[in-house]
Amino acid sequence: EPVLDPSIMPAANHFGGDLEGVLQTLEDGYFDALGMNTVWVSPVTQNAEGAWGLWQDSARTAVQSRFSSYHGYWPVSCTEVDRRYGGQPAMHALTDGAHAHGMNVLLDYVGNHVHEDHPLMEAHPDWTTELYLPDGSLNTERWDEHRLTTWFDTFMPTLNLERPEVAEAMSDSAAWWALHSGIDGFRHDATKHISEVFWRKLTAKLKAAQQRTGKRLFQIGETYGSPDLIGSYLSSGMLDAQFDFNLYDKAVGAIAFENGNWEDLVATNEASLSAYGAHHIMGNITGNQDRPRFTSLADGSLDVNEDMKFQGWTMDIQHSGDQGYAKMRLLMSYLMSVPGIPCVYYGDEIADVGGNDPDNRRMMRFDNLNPEERTTKEWTSAWARLRTSRMSLLFGNTAFAIL
């Protein structure tokens, strides 16, 4: 159900995917055949209508587009499932169906901010951080210098979760999902931008919910930063794990590019083992919704010295030769072999292509795969099954050798 607004380019609009489609894919046996045991779904809460924001290329000449809420990160409700995805019944059907097939469902949860159309903004306008800094400048995208207060955009108020009453209300909303949706855990958006006050309240409530449901929910966070910052959220009072983006970046550098720096990858892997433990459960990704597709980096379709979001808007990025497939298979082998939880971004199992967001969110292709795509999918499945069946890959010692 796309937003009918000509200022939104097609790639930044809704494409029609819904929870029923995820359930159908699960029931068709796709994830089981791939060797996966958990599905992480995008944020499903009711999102804003209409066109918002504006992206322009740096020269402000070739491309500009506003956006729909296709990504799910503009919530206007804390508990209602977006009607475009099928509403609450579709969410329950998905979790019930997943459990019937022995699979788990992780919900992408947005706790840091809301959309300005969220009812909270009328009821409690004082629950946000300040949009303007004391010097009069906008406090937007100040990811590190004002990480607990910065707004993502002017229409996305950041909640002041250091205030106990705000943290109490928002952690209640998150805990509601644990009690009423059937999910098995959370992927928490923008973890480092949220106060520990919230994380400790939420984790305490999830532990209380466990006493009622008998289910322990898994929590994995999203934090870009140093191992010390990432690790500061890992404790019995907060999260179970975070994604290891530092490791992914070094894996891209070593595997995707000619003359890759394997020494850097080894050093970063050893740093992760030192910081998080020899048998940690950090998330090791093949890609995600904030990065250009690995395959398009690996086969040279993308110019790393140019804006890869702009390239996604303006180029018809397709496969360039076979090396991207081979390098994706190498990345899969690596991530399935090191400590941590392998996390396959949809489409990477067939070495899908694309620039940065939104070009990295193309419609999933299940049919009419070429031979290299089929081989990559079979490779992914074989490694996933090895990972879950071989004790050496689950609990063995880790050592690195550069030949």
Stretches with model-predicted labels:
Residues 1, 7-15, 19-37, 46, ...:
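Carbohydrate-interacting/catalytic domains
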Residues 1, 39-41, 105-107, 186, ...:
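Hydrophobic faces of well-ordered beta-strands that scaffold small-molecule active sites
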Residues 1-181, 201-212, 228-230:
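Substrate-binding/active-site clefts of carbohydrate-active enzymes
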Residues 4, 8-11, 79-80, 307-320, ...:
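Short, basic, glycine/proline-bearing loop/turn elements
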Residues 78, 120-121, 127, 159, ...:
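Short clusters of hydrophobic/aromatic residues that line enzyme substrate/ligand-binding pockets
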Residues 86, 328-330:
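Outer-membrane beta-barrel transmembrane strands
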Residues 113, 172-175, 179-285, 334-337, ...:
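Active-site-proximal helices and loops of the catalytic beta/alpha 8
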Residues 189, 278-321, 359:
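Active-site clefts of carbohydrate-active enzymes
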